[in-house]
């Protein structure tokens, strides 16, 4: 059973999972109604690593039963008490950081250096952040006249559904769970079937800190478990992170029940480098080269991946000579080794999708500057899902510039001036992220305001602090993740309009 001690950690090379995971419902481990399980594999080697509950509508109903049974008491729990529980969750995660980071690496294939330095610290910080935000949240009082006052209260929605992706399994769960739980809601969460195990390690670790029914985790496939959750008339909100096509379906399901949605969907983010970045060979230029190479972070499996690079034509040759060298210096290898920079794609299906786009790019006439094929790392890793970091040169009308690949692939083109850079940057269906690099603050400001995207990194990229709003324009989504505004997204506002006058209005 979970306890307040550090859980045994046997090293990053030791499998961190149980042989089989049931669903976590009402504070207990509950076998799937059908009795069926599916096989989970690790992207590192392609080997089978355990069995996961294959849930259906009946399991979702059990989780909703538990959530509804808990919602009144949890919603009435004081903000101070809820915040203290959030802090305890963060503390226990921090004490078991190596265990959780290892579980993420085995489950997703990303390097242990990233899960240790980014995924888990960020996840922990989100619980602490929303504990603080909750304690600081205030209602309001409006004086209408001498005898009439309007009170405004923040109240939880009740029971909410959340569906998380496979690229940052635990971090994306914490992005959604922290504000929802802080706001006083009970949650039914469905992980991605590609990465179902790491979140269960986490649930086993912290599950006893929350009252039964506040957190419920049901594994399974999209149509079998995700659809029944998203279309249920027993949830007051659905939050989803994933592909835009699936997001449209989620929105359709929600519309049938007239419930709010938060959708964090696809992207094709431009990363724009102006000529002055190469004016000097200094720390800033080195930082810009790292910014270019950020397309390979997390194996390119990031919704904001800077997968389109725009370089001012006057510095193209100089910049790209150094950029290609930087990419070729990336160490690809066993994700469990601390010096590995890029690991495995999350699934064999994703690997095949990326390979198909490498073929598309070549057929479109794009020039391969480096990479362009699968990586065979030999030994036990030969069964894993590895792709070489790839740079294409082409133009923005190509499919590799317009369609989300979700892999370590970047497509590079040039621009003459700010106007052309802005035109190319905005020539996309998406609007999730963007990067602007320049030594000129005016250039950065004008470009940042002109780009139609929800997050514009300026002289940086892939930073995800809790106190910065994250979300998309256009077909990249609806609503925001992170930032204190997320607390409002999981609450509803009650207005009490109170008259203290003994006098009638006089209409009747």
From Swiss-Prot:
One of its GO terms (molecular function) is acetaldehyde dehydrogenase (NAD+) activity. It is an enzyme of class 1 (oxidoreductase). Its EC number is 1.2.1.3. SUPFAM superfamilies: ALDH-like. Coiled coil: none annotated. Pathway: Organosulfur degradation. Keywords: NAD, Oxidoreductase. The keyword Transmembrane does not apply. Induction: Induced by growth on hypotaurine. InterPro entries: Ald_DH/histidinol_DH (IPR016161), Ald_DH_C (IPR016163), Ald_DH_CS_CYS (IPR016160), Ald_DH_CS_GLU (IPR029510), Ald_DH_N (IPR016162), Aldehyde_DH_dom (IPR015590). It catalyses: acetaldehyde + NAD(+) + H2O = acetate + NADH + 2 H(+). Signal peptide: none annotated. The active site is at 264, 303. Belongs to the aldehyde dehydrogenase family. Catalyzes the NAD(+)-dependent oxidation of acetaldehyde to acetate. This is Aldehyde dehydrogenase. It comes from Paracoccus denitrificans (strain Pd 1222).
